[in-house]
């Protein structure tokens, strides 16, 4: 048994490991977010120590991004579905695939260790010096966090190499690039983004480590360096990273809309591919919109504003293509379609607040306020997470051979929908009123919206517990899937046996072009 999991080279087993790891990390991250909302539910102090509060905020961000969304989307769905959708026997490098999973638990262990030794890493996920330098954060906490991110980065780079090689070399005969499913495209583009952006982060963090431990002065003004040089390096990684988090979600939502609505093809499939490529490319040239407040030249600001707004064009193409795919169908409100519709609506809201923040004069007022928190949580907490749950419900019968209870799933969807909106919508008002991020206390004027926001987080907690109960119920009752209701145009459902056998295909499939 232990050999099956520890030494596995099977993409389905490794994908399952990623899912288990991601769900567990997601529960840790959710617990941390509830601590944050408990602290902010009322003015005054609950935790009592702001360093601990900042450590919780930092750990919440890192865990949700690197140990929940990325392992589930790229590691879980990517490993399970890409080989099946390509008709490949497995991934290109199965043993490397196993290694890239088993580097993640040590990485998470290091991150949690960084929070519980010394004073914890209370730097925020951006890890800016001088706060992250050895003056403000002496001791080993920040070093442990950096080492943890190095490991997570190695994991992602290895995974990216594996996906790119698999997609280029292991398609079945006759499958051209434009015939690949949109989810495979989205994972491929995501892998390319990871491969290009993570080395920059590794370089920045290595320089920060030597500044802290080896007396160099890469980011130290005393050594004649520019302090915000690290911000350029960090955000050159950090902005593509947010597209890395959402692109596989785009692919999943595209698959869901045309499979669940029984369309043979998605509307504007080629346009969707080009839109994802454009988003990936533009994601690399807009990083400084996170840094409007460092004091930039007017021409630089004009460039980053326009470039940021241009990203809205391919994103708009995707949203209207999804709506066009739905057009003319009798919408079947199955749980996964509810999540997908929720994704489209809430992701659009998050995107619109992003266009607001792209304007430097507005951003200077709103930078580091709760308006920014609301913006990126609409995109991540209601974009990435909704896509994950939609995909999980849709492909759960493929992964397990079991069915979930659709009635409970609908109750859970509406609970979660109300919970997340009640949590994050009021934060727009708090931000416009000037409440800053990363503070554990606030003036009494902000109390009403904070109480509502914290109430929403408790409802979201109930929803998370509900979906865990629904999955547990399905596994206890073992309601087997007798036959797949999906069209044969989707190759992952091709086998009559669910879940697929250890070797997916006895012989490689043939693609017929009519």
UniProtKB/Swiss-Prot annotation:
List the transmembrane segments: 16-36, 62-82, 101-121, 144-164, 182-202, 233-253, 267-287, 304-324, 337-357, 379-399, 413-433, 451-471
Q: What compartments host this protein?
A: Mitochondrion inner membrane
Top-level taxon of origin = Eukaryota
Q: Would you indicate the residue range of the signal peptide? A: none
Quote a single Gene Ontology cellular component term: mitochondrial inner membrane
Which residues bind Fe(II)-heme a per the record? 60, 377
Q: Where does Ca(2+) bind?
A: 39, 44
Q: Which residues bind heme a3?
A: 375
- Give the similarity note: Belongs to the heme-copper respiratory oxidase family.
- Give the quaternary structure: Component of the cytochrome c oxidase (complex IV, CIV), a multisubunit enzyme composed of a catalytic core of 3 subunits and several supernumerary subunits. The complex exists as a monomer or a dimer and forms supercomplexes (SCs) in the inner mitochondrial membrane with ubiquinol-cytochrome c oxidoreductase (cytochrome b-c1 complex, complex III, CIII).
Please identify the protein, giving its name as recorded: Cytochrome c oxidase subunit 1
């Amino acid at each position: 048994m232990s050999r099956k999991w520890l030494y596995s080279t099977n993409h389905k087993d490794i994908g399952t490991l990623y899912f288990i790891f991601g769900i567990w990390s997601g529960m840790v991250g959710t617990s941390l977010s509830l601590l944050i909302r408990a602290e902010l539910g009322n003015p005054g102090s609950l935790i009592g120590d702001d360093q601990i509060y900042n450590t919780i905020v930092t750990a919440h961000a890192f865990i949700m991004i690197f140990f929940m969304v990325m392992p589930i989307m790229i590691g879980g769905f990517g490993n399970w579905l890409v080989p099946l959708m390509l008709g490949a026997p497995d991934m290109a490098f199965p043993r490397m695939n196993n290694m890239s999973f088993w580097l993640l638990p040590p990485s998470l262990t290091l991150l949690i260790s960084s929070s519980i030794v010394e004073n914890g890493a209370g730097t925020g996920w951006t890890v800016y010096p001088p706060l992250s330098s050895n003056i403000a954060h002496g001791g080993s906490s920040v070093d442990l966090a950096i080492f943890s991110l190095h490991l997570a980065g190695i994991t992602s780079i290895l995974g990216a190499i594996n996906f790119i090689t698999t997609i280029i070399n292991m398609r079945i005969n006759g499958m051209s690039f434009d015939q690949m499913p949109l989810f495979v495209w989205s994972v491929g583009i995501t892998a390319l983004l990871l491969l290009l952006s993570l080395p920059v982060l590794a370089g920045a963090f290595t320089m920060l480590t030597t500044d802290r431990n080896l007396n160099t002065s890469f980011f130290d003004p005393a050594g004649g360096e520019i302090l915000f040089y690290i911000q350029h390096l960090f955000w050159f990684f950090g902005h593509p990273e947010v597209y890395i988090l959402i692109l596989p979600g785009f692919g999943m939502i595209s698959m869901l809309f045309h499979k669940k609505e029984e369309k043979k093809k998605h509307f504007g499939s080629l346009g969707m591919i080009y839109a994802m490529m454009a988003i990936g490319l533009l994601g690399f040239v807009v990083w400084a919109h996170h840094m409007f407040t460092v004091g930039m030249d007017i021409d630089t600001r004009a460039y980053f504003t326009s470039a940021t707004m241009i990203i809205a064009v391919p994103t708009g193409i995707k949203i209207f293509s999804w709506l066009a795919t739905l057009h003319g169908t009798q919408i079947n409100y199955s749980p996964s379609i509810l999540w997908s519709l929720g994704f489209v609506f809430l992701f659009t809201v998050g995107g619109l607040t992003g266009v607001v923040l792209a304007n430097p004069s507005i951003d200077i007022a709103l930078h580091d306020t709760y308006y920014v928190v609301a913006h990126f949580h609409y995109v991540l907490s209601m974009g990435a997470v909704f896509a994950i749950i939609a995909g999980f419900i849709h492909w759960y019968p493929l992964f397990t051979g079991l069915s979930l209870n659709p009635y409970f799933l609908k109750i859970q969807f509406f609970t979660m929908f109300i919970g997340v909106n009640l949590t994050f919508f009021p934060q727009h008002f708090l931000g416009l009123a000037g409440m800053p991020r990363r503070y554990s206390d606030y003036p009494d004027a902000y109390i009403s919206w904070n109480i509502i926001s914290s109430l929403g987080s408790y409802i979201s907690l109930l929803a998370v517990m509900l979906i865990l109960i629904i999955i547990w119920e399905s596994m206890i009752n073992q309601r087997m899937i007798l036959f797949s209701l999906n069209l044969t145009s989707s190759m992952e459902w091709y086998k009559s046996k669910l879940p697929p056998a250890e070797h997916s295909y006895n012989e490689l499939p043939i693609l017929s072009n009519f």
